[in-house]
Structure formats: C-alpha cells, structure tokens
Curated annotation (Swiss-Prot):
Residue span(s) of the pro-peptide: 16-41, 54-55
GO biological process: defense response
The protein's name in its UniProt record: Riparin-1.5 acid
Tissue specificity as recorded in UniProt: Expressed by the skin glands.
Keywords on record: Amphibian defense peptide, Disulfide bond, Secreted, Signal
Subcellular location: Secreted
Source organism (scientific name): Crinia riparia (Streambank froglet)
Disulfide bonds: C47-C53
Cleavable signal peptide: 1-15
C-alpha cells in the first residue's frame, strides 16, 4: 500500500516539475538549462551532484 502512495506522490512531483519548467521556459526562452537543472535537482539523490554515490 505504501508503494502506491509513493508512486502517486512521485507522479505529482514530476507533474509539478514539468509545469514549473514549462513556465520557466516561457519566461526565459534563452535559458534552456533551467528545466534540466530542475529535473536533476528533483530526481537525482544529493550525492549524485557531488559524485559521491557508491553503487
């Protein structure tokens, strides 16, 4: 049951990221990096930014 809730939250967050990035793209069409930056911020663990993940 928890997995379903987690997936629902994840879908909501991803939808919000899409909306925010779309709004940012409208405001600043020359700044392509913003949407990719947002996706990285939301979907990668913090250690991925520093490159300290141990797999």
């Amino acid at each position: 049951m928890k997995i379903i809730v987690f997936l629902a939250v994840l879908m909501l967050v991803s939808a919000q990221v899409c909306l925010v990035s779309a709004a940012e793209m409208e405001h600043s069409s020359d700044n392509e990096l913003s949407s990719r930056d947002l996706v990285k911020r939301f979907f990668l663990p913090p250690c991925a930014h520093k490159g300290t993940c141990n797999h």
